[in-house]
Structures are given as C-alpha cells and as structure tokens.
Amino acid sequence: RDQDERIIVIHNFVHACAGAGKTELIVQRCANTADQKRRLVITLTDSGQAELISRLSGVCSKSQMPDVMGWYAFMIRHYVRPYLPILFPHVRPTGFIFDRAMHPKDHFKLGGSRRYFSSNGSIYKETLPELAVKVAEASQGAVEKRLGRIYDEIIIDEVQDISRKSLDIIERLLSQA
C-alpha cells in the first residue's frame, strides 16, 4: 500500500499512523516556497518540537519558518490567556502545573475557577483542555476567528497522543475551516 494513502489531510489537519512520514510531510509543506502562508505547527512533546524546529530550520527561510509550539502552550497562549476574563474575570494565570502528582486529588470535583487553577493561579494540566473548550464556547467563536487572523494554516503533529477533551478543541478548529 502506498504511503500517501495512509495520510489523511482534512482542511489543515494532518493525521497519520506512527512512521508514516507525517513529520516529513509537515516539513515539506512548510518548505513550499510557492506560498507565503503564516503557519503554526503544534506538537505534543518537547522532543517533537525540537525535532520539528531542527528539520524546519534546515529547509525554511526565515520568512517561511512557521511558529512551532507545544499543545499546552497553544491552549494557554491562544485560548486561556486572551479569553479567560469571559469566564473568570478576576483570575490571572501565573503558571502551569504539569506534574499530575502536584494536583489536588479532588480538583475535578471543585466548581468554578478552583477546578482549573491552584490557589496561586497556576493552571492544572489535567483540566487545561476542558478549560480551553469552555473558554472557546464562552467566546462564541472569537478564539477561532482570532486564530484565523493570525495564521493561514494550523498543523497539528502527534495528535494520536492527546486527550479526548483536546480532540474537542481540534473539532472546533476543523469546524471553522
């Protein structure tokens, strides 16, 4: 079976099984000198980001180089920080708690901002996707419209490793395309 048949491109969403060459497809798409698209490439892991930046640096001019960021940074930078005041006007994110062991055992049972934030304002990794979806819903499409003004194309790598709630964010992005 031809490798290209295993790669599915829907709008600007690339999904393929491990080893199918999707990272190379992303690199080649970004290296295309025929277009001058403003691109964002999102990947789940730090190692994935480092690999993409290294490979893209080898084939993209400075003007072609896409923004590369992690999934959690994407949710914080483009969903939570700009639109959090819609849900929680008095909360200011101060950090990010990645380590699940640092989360209170009962934070999922809590209501309001305490479900998503520690007492000092740090965002819990486990509830960040849920918070991002709630912020997007409350913004009534403003999050996706803003992303559309910033980027012509959003490419997500390593999507097979993200959480179910994170897939809701991707679904929202695809529905805006």
Feature map (PLM): residue ranges:
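Alpha-helix boundary/capping detector
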Residues: 52-53, 101, 173
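Inter-Walker segment of RecA-like/P-loop motor cores
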Residues: 43, 61-134
